[in-house]
Regions:
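Conserved catalytic or regulatory cores that recognize and/or transform ribose-phosphate-containing ligands
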Residues: 1-379
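Walker A/P-loop phosphate-binding element recognition
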Residues: 375-395
Length: 395
């Protein structure tokens, strides 16, 4: 009857509604290991228990430090996998979906693993012209590696868009023409890939600046609505996540979906890695962008980072910490451990609130019942966590 039909409809609605807080933790990796470890060990288990008791919900933190399989890395799919995970969080989470840890490292800037034929051939023309003008520039002579490593695939064509664009989707201009593409070969059997990558990266970046001066200008880079394929030679994976996980959201959605943690280490720029070999987690180069054999500060990367952080809405900053260089983040330092605890507590409060709001949306009970359950939970959850619990989700 009608009553049964109503119950069935309500059950179906609940089945389709997201029942998890699914969150992408976005940052450069080598400089935020301790923050990530602390959040996964201390905050995640608490949120999981809180969500479970609040109506059988889930809390998930997507951790990409171990999320890129070797084969995917060899095929240069790191950026694509990260963006897919971010999109999945935005689609599947009933609340917060993106947390950005803003520190002092801009991070990995891969060039696209697929370049539309017309763009690739234009870039080669620019490099050839630059080489004719500057025959002794070694960076330009490395353009021959582009011809060796990129191969035209006539069958590689992006599908027609069959759905209405979602809010966080990269624009058509950022995706570029549909193909065919020049596709980057696998690096699986290349022992000196890093050197080859850096040579091609410099050459492509130099050509992109000349070919697309307007699209790569500071003004264009500050406007997420004007993203262009040219910028894919310049921006880091972390900034692309930041653009799609925060900047492209409406002002109303940002407040429900994104949070930012800021950290500044005093004395980092003055520190040095020269002299004795430092253990992992204590090297300056893990915490800030360095370039070349002399390990000088990468001023271009730092400029991009400053611009990115400058675009962060202040009302989304849940915590801001300032600490002294350890070296690194030193778990033997009371100041550093206090910083980690305060950071985790501030984030936990916001995520707990997000879970509570999500519980109201997916629950068939009145809001007052959910709030009463939440009050009991705040009193009843007292758990000691020994060691680290890592939760890892892949697409």
């Amino acid at each position: 009857g009608a009553v049964g039909d109503g119950a069935d409809a309500r059950t179906e609605l609940l089945r389709r509604q997201p029942r998890a807080l699914r969150l992408l933790l976005s940052s450069t990796f080598t400089d935020t290991n301790e923050e990530r470890n602390y959040l996964l060990a201390d905050v995640l288990p608490y949120l999981q228990e809180y969500a479970r008791r609040l109506g059988g919900l889930e809390a998930q933190i997507v951790e990409m430090r171990w999320g890129i399989r070797e084969q995917a890395s060899d095929n240069h799919e790191t950026s694509e996998i990260c963006m897919n995970e971010l999109e999945r969080c935005l689609q599947e989470s009933f609340g917060m979906a993106y947390v950005f840890i803003a520190a002092q490292k801009y991070g990995f800037r891969p060039f696209p693993n697929k370049i539309p034929r017309e763009y690739f051939e234009q870039l080669l023309q620019v490099l050839k012209s630059q080489e004719d003008r500057q025959p002794h520039d070694k960076e330009l002579r490395d353009m021959t590696q582009l011809q060796e490593w990129f191969q035209l695939d006539q069958n590689e064509v992006a599908p027609e868009q069959e759905h209405a664009p979602v809010e966080t989707e990269a624009s058509a201009a950022f995706r570029g023409p549909r193909g065919p593409y020049y596709v980057l070969k696998s690096k699986a059997k290349c022992d000196d890939w890093r050197e080859k990558f850096e040579a091609m990266q410099k050459a492509l970046r130099k050509a992109a600046f000349e070919l697309w001066p307007q699209e790569t200008s500071e003004q264009a880079m500050k406007d997420p609505s004007k993203r262009h394929f040219a910028q894919r030679f310049l921006i880091s994976v972390t900034e692309e996540e930041f653009t799609r996980g925060l900047l492209l959201l409406s002002e109303e959605n940002r407040k429900k979906r994104a949070l930012v943690i800021k950290r500044h280490i005093k004395g980092l720029e003055e520190a040095t890695d020269k002299g004795e070999e430092k253990p992992e987690g204590q090297r300056k180069g893990e915490f800030i962008d360095l370039i070349g054999k002399e390990a000088n500060l990468d001023t271009e990367a730092q400029k991009r980072l400053k611009a990115q952080i400058g675009m962060t809405p202040e009302d989304l900053v849940v915590f801001e910490g300032v600490i002294d260089w350890g070296p690194g983040i030193n778990l033997g330092s009371l100041d550093h451990v206090t910083y980690l605890k305060k950071m985790a507590d501030a984030l936990c409060i916001k995520l707990k609130d997000s879970i509570l709001e999500g519980a109201k949306e997916v629950s068939v009970e009145p809001d007052t019942v959910v709030e009463e359950a939440a009050r009991h939970l705040r009193l009843s959850i007292h758990v000691n966590y020994l060691g680290f619990v890592f939760c890892h989700f892949l697409a």
